[in-house]
Amino acid sequence: MLLETPAEMALDTAKRFRELRSAKRVTMKALSTASGVPYSTIRRFEGTGEISFLSLVKLTSALGEDEEIRGLFANRTPASIEEVIRGNRR
């Protein structure tokens, strides 16, 4: 699936988050208690994709998926020499 807009990316992220939460058999209420994020915020996020970054970090951590957040802007190893050359031109 090619994501074209920030809104589409946010909705797709919310969908994947909901699937992860469900796979771990964690209810929104239990996640709210564990994370300190209000139930209404979780419900809004899963429905619209809208959430503050800090709340997303808290939810992700409560699900034991801290590495997902840590990997967001991690240094990435270039896949090819062309990528290295392009990067040096910027």
Regions found by a protein language model. Give the residues of each.
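A short, Lys/Arg-rich alpha-helix, primarily the initiator
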Residues: 1-23, 72
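Short basic helix-loop element that most often maps to the first helix and adjoining turn
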Residues: 15-31, 88-90
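Short alpha-helical DNA-recognition segment
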Residues: 25-43
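Short acidic/histidine-centered micro-motifs embedded in hydrophobic/aromatic stretches
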Residues: 34, 59, 72-76
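Short, charged recognition helix plus adjacent turn
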Residues: 70-90
